[in-house]
Design a protein with these regions (language model features):
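Phosphate-group recognition and catalysis centered on beta-loop-alpha active-site segments
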Residues: 1-262
Length: 262
C-alpha cells in the first residue's frame, strides 16, 4: 500500500513539530510535553512528532530518552520505574511526562509521528492506538527494524509505517536492489539530510532520491532541519515533509511559499 492509501498523509509539504518543537523559544527545556505540543498546535501545526517508552508496569509515555536524567528532575531508566514514579518527574522542573493516550486526547485534530524507542513499548503502542481508534492519526517508525516488524505483525496494514533502516540504506547506497523496495511495507522514508560514513559526510537527500522514493508511492520526510536555507533547499528538491525543532522558522518558510497551514 502506498502513502496515498492512508488518510494520515496530507498533501505535501507538511511540517512536523519535533518533540513538540523543542527549539522554539517557548519550548526550551520542555520537549515532549503537553505544553510544548500546545505551542505547536497554536502555531497551526497539525503534525506532531514524539517517541515512546514503556514504564515497568506497562504505561506508554511520550518521552525520547531511555532515562529521565537529562530533561527531568528525577533519575532512572523508564523501563525500571513504575508509572507513579515517572509521573512525579517534571520536565524542565515544571511539566509532567505525558502518556501517549493523554497526547492523543489533548489534540484530537493532530496527527502524530511516533518513534518506538524500546521493545517493551511495541504492544502498549498498538493497544493505545486501538483503544483510541487512532489508526488514521498516526505513523509509526523506529531505528530498530526488529521493533518495527514487531509492530507491523500486530497492526497489519491498518497503520502507516516508515521504511526501516534497511530501506533507508537500500534507497541511497544500494541502487541495484532499489527495485525490491516496490514491495516495502513502509509508506514514508524518514531520513536525515546527511550521514557520516568512515569520516566522510555524505548528502543523503538528493532529487534522484526523492524521485525514486516517489516512484514507489512513498513520501520523503527529512529530520531534523532547523535552518531556513536548508528547509528551502529540501522543499525545492520536492520532499514531502520536514521535521523541525524550530517550528517558528519552518512555519515562516512554508507560509512564504503559500503552504501554511500545511
Amino acid at each position: 500500500m502506498s502513502a496515498a492509501d492512508y488518510p494520515y498523509f496530507a498533501p505535501p509539504p507538511i511540517g512536523l513539530a519535533h518533540r513538540g518543537g523543542a527549539g522554539h523559544p517557548a519550548n526550551l527545556g520542555i520537549e515532549n510535553t503537553l505544553a510544548a505540543f500546545a505551542t505547536a498546535v497554536s502555531l497551526g501545526y497539525r503534525y506532531l512528532e514524539t517517541d515512546v517508552h514503556a514504564t515497568r508496569d506497562g504505561q506508554l509515555v511520550a518521552f525520547h530518552d531511555e532515562h529521565l536524567d537529562r530533561v527531568t528532575d528525577r533519575e532512572g531508566a523508564i523501563a525500571d520505574l513504575p508509572w507513579r514514579e515517572v509521573a512525579a518527574a517534571r520536565i524542565g522542573g515544571r511539566e509532567p511526562v505525558p502518556r501517549l493516550d493523554e497526547l492523543l486526547e489533548a489534540f484530537p485534530g493532530a496527527r502524530i509521528n511516533i518513534d518506538i524507542k524500546a521493545p517493551a513499548a511495541v504492544e502498549p503502542l498498538w493497544e493505545t492506538i486501538r483503544a483510541h481508534a487512532a489508526y488514521d492519526r498516526v505513523c509509526v517508525g523506529s531505528f530498530s527494524d526488529r521493533r518495527l516488524h514487531a509492530f507491523r505483525r500486530l497492526a497489519g496494514p491498518r497503520v502507516a509505517t516508515a521504511a526501516g533502516q534497511l530501506g533507508t540504506a537500500a534507497l541511497r547506497y544500494l541502487p541495484h536492489v532499489v527495485s525490491a523496495l516496490a514491495h516495502s511495507p513502509g509508506q514514508v522514508l524518514q531520513i536525515p539530510t546527511t550521514h557520516v560514513v568512515r569520516g566522510r559526510t555524505l548528502t543523503l537527500v538528493t532529487r534522484d532520491l526523492v524521485d525514486t522514493v516517489h516512484r514507489f508511492g512513498m513520501q520523503v520526510h527529512v529530520w531534523t532541519v532547523d535552518e531556513p536555507t536548508q528547509m528551502q533547499r529540501l522543499l525545492d528538491l520536492g520532499v514531502d515533509g520536514i521535521v523541525s525543532d524550530r517550528i517558528d522558522l519552518l512555519r515562516d518558510v512554508l507560509a512564504a511559499r503559500g503552504r501554511w497551514p500545511s
